[in-house]
Amino acid sequence: MDEYYLLTFESTHAAISTEKLLKPAEVTIMPVPRFISASCGISVRIRPDMRESSENIFRESSKLTTDDYSYYHVIRDRASGDVQCNKLEPIK
């Protein structure tokens, strides 16, 4: 089972600035998975154990509006390849 949180962005600039902002939370920048559609094609992957600290940093320091990004919870079954992807409320 592979579980993670994902931020997708409307612009490459927003993706790169968020990745730099969340660097202390050990996030990973990656292409947006095929099962999600996002404009710029870049996403930031957050491990479940780093979710709370990532959200706190993002909430306190990000200048993005809720129109600039989308937030997802992803669970992928490695054996079957099945993916469960739920869009979450924006980080507030």
Model features per residue range: what roles?
Residues 2, 39-41, 66:
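Short connector loops at helix/strand junctions that flank enzyme active sites
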Residues 2-29:
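N-terminal first-folded block
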Residues 4-8, 43-45, 70-73:
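Ordered hydrophobic segments in well-structured contexts
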Residues 12, 27-55:
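Amphipathic, hydrophobic secondary-structure cores in small proteins
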Residues 18-23, 54-64:
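Short amphipathic alpha-helices in soluble, non-transmembrane regions
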